[in-house]
Amino acid sequence: MQKGNIGVTTENIFPIIKKFLYSDHEIFLRELVSNAVDATQKLKTLASKGEFKGEMGDLTVKVSLNADTITISDRGIGLTAEEIEKYINQIAFSGANDFLDKYKDDANAIIGHFGLGFYSAFMVAKKVEIITKSYREDAQAVKWTCDGSPEFTIEDVEKADRGSDIILYIDDDCKEFLEEARISALLTKYCRFLPIPVAFGKKKEWKDGKQVETNEDNIINETYPLWTRKPVELKDEDYKKFYQELYPMADEPLFWIHLNVDYPFNLTGILYFPKIKSNIELQRNKIQLYCNQVYVTDSVEGIVPDFLTLLHGVIDSPDIPLNVSRSYLQSDSNVKKISTYISKKVSDRLQAIFKNNRKEFEEKWDDLKIFINYGMLTQEDFYEKANKFALLKDTDGKYYTYEEYQSLIKDNQTDKDGNLIYLYSNNMDEQYSYIDAAKNRGYNILLMDGQLDVAMISMLEQKFEKSRFTRVDSDVIDRLIAKEEHKEANLESNQREILSSVFRSQLPQIKKVEFNVETQSLGENGAPIMITQSEYMRRMKEMANIQAGMSFYGEMPNMYNLVLNADHKLVKQVLTDAGNSCKAALEPIESEMANLNNRRKELQKAQEGKKTEDIPQAEKDELNDIEKKISDETTKKQAVLGEYANGNKIIHQLIDLALLQNNMLKGEALTNFVKRSIELI
C-alpha cells in the first residue's frame, strides 16, 4: 500500500467544495456519470483506430445504491497507478484549487459548474474510493482511497474486468442521495441523452398486485437523441413525439427548426415554437442547453437573444464556455456568433413559412404574434427581417402585412395634414359602437389586444413615416381622422355653460377618474352623448403598467371627455327645459354677474400699462372683491342648475348610458339605472 499527499495548499478541500457549491450538490452525479461515459467513448475510439483489440462487450455505465454508498461503474479505458497519480492526485485536485480560487466570489453564476469533474464527488461524500483496471494488457488493478483531506492511499487489488468503479460513501447530511427516487430524477435530468447506455437498477413490472424487479437493466437514457440525427431521416411525427417527451404537459408546437452547423462553431439542436400564452415570464427557461449530450442548464440568457428564450427545445454545443460567469458570455466571440446564427435561422424559418404557405402562417399568427413582436421590440436586426412577414389583424379577422395595410387605408384614412391614421380597438365587445361608427365611415379598424401591442404601437409610429395610431374610442368619429377644420357647435357661451353645468353636476364620483364636459356638433343622427379618452394620456398610463420609469403617469387620474351632441333632440330638449325651468332663478344671478363683469373690465382697462406699485390700493381691493363676488355668483348659478339636473331623468339616463357603454356603470348606480329604465318604459 502506498500513502501520499495530494499536491494542494488547502488543508481539507472537501468542506470548502461543499460550502462553496452548497446549492448545486446534485451535479456530482452528472460529473461522475459523464466521466464514465467519456472513458467508455475513449475505448470505442481506440478500438476504431485498432489500438484496442480486446472484446468490447457490454459498455453500459451502471449506477447502483446500497445502504451507505453510490457506485458509478464503467467498462471504459480504466486507469493505471501512474495515471491515477497524474490525473487524480495532480490534475484533478489542482484543477479544484484553481476553480475555487478563480470563482469563489461568483460561485452561483458559473454556467452549470461544468468542468468540476471528479472532485465534485466530495460535495456529497465523506470518503471516495476508485477501483480501476486499465484496458492495457497485463494491467494491475488498483484501489485509491481519500477522505477529502490531502492524504490518500493507493494499493493493488484484484479486479476481473477493465474499467472503473467510483464508490462514494455518502455524508450524513446528504442522505437524500441514497434515495432511489432522487437518483432516478437526477439521472433523468442530467443524463437522459448521454451517448452511452446508463443503467440504474432493473426494470420493474406488475406481478401479483405489486411491482417486482425483472432481470433487465433499467436504461435511463436515449443514446441517439433526435437532434443528433439528420433532418432527412426524420418525419413530423418524430419531432412532435420528441417535444412531448421534453414537455409532457404542453400543447403541440406550431413548428420547429433543426439546427446543425459545424463551422465556424459546433452547434446542434431543435428549437420549437410553442403556443405562447399571454404571460411571457411563464414561457422562459424552456430551452435546455447540453454539452456533448450532457445537460447543463435551462437558463440560456446570454447564449440566445432574449426574445428567443420564449422558444422551447434543445441546443447542444461544445463551443459555449461553461466554466465562466454569465456576464463573460456576452463578450465571448463564439457565443455571439451562435446567438446571431440562431436568430437568423429563426427569422429565415418564419420568412419561409410566410412565403410558401401564407394560409398556414395566418392561422398560426395569433400564437406567434407575441413572440415576433417581442423580437421586433428588442432586436433591431430582427425587426429589419420580420417587418416583411409580421402581420396586422383587423376586427373582421383579416390579416395584412405592414405594406399591404398601408395600401389598404391610405386613400380613406389620411387626415388633412397628410398623416396616415391607423384606427385600432383593444376590446371589440366594449368598443363595439365606436367600431361600428368607424366602419360606417368606410374605415378599417385593427385589433390590437395583445400583451405587447401598446409598446408595438409606439415603436411602429416611430418606424412608419407620417403615421399615427389612434384607438377608436379616443375621440368622436369626426375627429378621429380630421379631414377638415373642426366646426364647433352653434351655441352661445351661456348655452354651453348651462349644458356643461347640468351634466357635470350629475356625474358620479369615481376613484382616480376625472371628466371634462364638452359640446360638439355631431349631427342629428349621431349619439346624444359619448365618453372618449385622449389617446396620449391613456397610452402613457398603459405604458406605465409595463415599463419602468413611467410611474408618474400611472399615478395620474384617468381623464375622460363627456361629449354632448348639441344637434341631438334629447340634448336640445335638456337645454330648452333647463333654460325655461331655471329662468326665474337665474335672471337675477346673471344680471348681477353681467354688472360685475362690466365693472371688472373697466378696472382692468384702467390698469393696463401700469406697474403694480402705481395702481391705487383701493382699485386693487375692489378688483379682488369683484373676483370673489363673481365666484360666489357662479357657485349660486351652478347650484340652481344642479338642483334642476338632479330631478331630470333624461340627464341621468344619458350619463348612465354613456357610462354603461364604457363599462363604468357598476353597483348601486347600475341598479338605479335599471329601475329608471323600467320607469321610463
Predicted regions and their residues:
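GHKL/Bergerat-fold ATPase module in large chromosome/replication-associated machines
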Residues: 110, 128-151, 171-175, 181-681
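GHKL (Bergerat-fold) ATPase N-terminal catalytic module, capturing the glycine-rich phosphate-binding loop
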Residues: 1-172, 176-177, 185, 587-591, ...
